[in-house]
């Protein structure tokens, strides 16, 4: 089973999304649980996400008609996943420059 860790950018993204949801009266806990469940699936299926640029992968996390995207890297030798960033599908892009 792959180990999962979060970059400081991904943690900041979760906080930003949480703040947005709570300010707009949306169910923050339900959304964060949904993201957590999707990321946990990657422990058993680390290549589940679609290929992205620079050898990275994107996990699409559906929530009704919309959802979220988690950008991550997977290191086969270490069996380790690093979640680099998380955004809403309607956002134009990730909020930080990703190497």
Feature locations, PLM:
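Enriched for short, Lys/Arg-rich terminal
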Residues: 22, 29, 63-99
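GIY-YIG nuclease signature motif recognition
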Residues: 10, 35, 72
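Conserved amphipathic alpha-helical interaction elements at protein-protein interfaces in regulatory
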Residues: 16, 23, 41-44, 78
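Arg/Lys-rich, positively charged N-terminal/basic patches that mediate binding to nucleic acids
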Residues: 1-32
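A short, surface-exposed loop/turn module that caps and links secondary-structure elements
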Residues: 37-64
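Amphipathic, hydrophobic secondary-structure cores in small proteins
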Residues: 32, 56-59, 69
């Amino acid at each position: 089973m792959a180990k999962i860790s979060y970059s400081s950018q991904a943690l900041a993204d979760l906080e930003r999304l949480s703040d947005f949801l709570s300010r707009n009266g949306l169910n923050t806990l339900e959304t964060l649980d949904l993201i957590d469940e999707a990321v946990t699936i990657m422990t058993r299926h680390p290549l589940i996400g679609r290929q992205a640029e620079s050898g990275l992968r994107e996990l699409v996390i559906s929530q009704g008609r919309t959802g979220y995207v988690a950008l991550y890297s997977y290191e086969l030798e270490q069996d380790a996943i690093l979640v680099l960033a998380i955004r809403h599908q309607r956002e134009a892009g990730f909020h930080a420059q990703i190497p």
